[in-house]
Amino acid sequence: MPPPPTPRKEIVIQEDVSPSLERVKVFSWNVLCDKYATASTYGYTPTRALNWDYRKSCILEELRLRDADFLALQEVSTDAFKEDLSPALAQMDYKGVHWPKSRARTMSEKDALTVDGCAMFYKGSKYILLDKQLIEFASIAINRPDMKNQHDVFNRVMPKDNIAIICFLESRLTGARLILVNVHLTWDSALADVKVIQTGILMEHVTKLAEKYARWPAVKDKKMITVPGGDEGDPPPPPQAEPGPSQEYRSNTEIPLLVCGDFNSTEDSSVYELMSMGRVPPDHLELSNYHYGSFTRDGIEHPFSLRDAYAHIKGTAEELPFTNYTPGFADVIDYIWYSTNTLEVVDVLGPPDAAYLKRMPAFPNWHFPADHIQIMAEFVIKGRKEKKQQQQQQQQHAERESGSGSGTPRA
């Protein structure tokens, strides 16, 4: 076994962060489904390093080490979720949500277990799951009135059974709410149009769901919603702080939003443009030769102000050289997008050891159990205007009270 790399560092983006602001740490990783980890695809990887039992232990150790609030994992098969990840992560305070790709529904129960999909884990002692939704791109496209009769939908979008998961959560302690999205787009480089259509469908659903979530009722009796515990005989958990009331949001763009995953798209793609700019015009090179209803007639857009968390270190020595590292391809295709009006980046997980990479032409290997690397960012939830106004009013009121009651003569 070759010597290990030096550990990846967390790169501080903002040093002066108010301790009163709530922090959220988000981790995203395509873990390479066991079914795809074959010697024919990864002939350069030692056989034992490709073995699922070995890779699983490396993956779980990495998740334990990073200790994020949210884990967005792609290429997780149903059996890996049920048998391996959920039980082990439950010991680390995580609860999970998983859906396999759509093909699982057409298979026998046994075969369906090996189908990969997306898994989202969250710290059960810190967050309550209010809602979860599965987004199946092919079935949504084929049922859209403006798309269902178009050949390009049948021939290009429909055969790809990629999915996304949308979770709506609330902090037990502060009542702050978040929308967390985990997505895995199609990989085929010849299907750039399909990737941006999938992204358009995703953001359309995020927009509609966020409108619904802005009207979501407050959580009653938070104390009654159980916190995941250990085994019988374990010491009781420490007493919980008094939970705060559910926060209220006036519109869909006010709720903090995080969109993570394997987008299989580089920075020069229409997918990146749509996420970062909020719009892709109908005459975009990756769309102009196809017919996808209103998406190719009017363009694709979403109302959120999103930024790639790693954009903060672009052009610096700490810039990520890739997130996917194979002999034929090395580039950034995985992202953590965040809503800039509600969240600020505090730090991100830096690149792998550069000297080590010179010795290692590709992943997976003994130290990196998947062909993708992990990405992680920590955020603070921005203070809200009404809260600030409330605090200012309370302060002014207190000052007036102390001023009028002090007996100090006024000029």
Regions found by a protein language model. Give the residues of each.
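Structured beta-strand-rich core segments of catalytic domains in phosphoester-bond hydrolases
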Residues: 2-23, 70-193, 299-303, 336, ...
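Proline-aspartate-enriched helix->loop->beta-strand connector
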Residues: 56, 61-76
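Residue-level marker for buried hydrophobic side chains located in beta-strands
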Residues: 26-27, 259
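Metal-dependent phosphoester-hydrolase catalytic domains
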Residues: 1-15, 126, 159, 168, ...
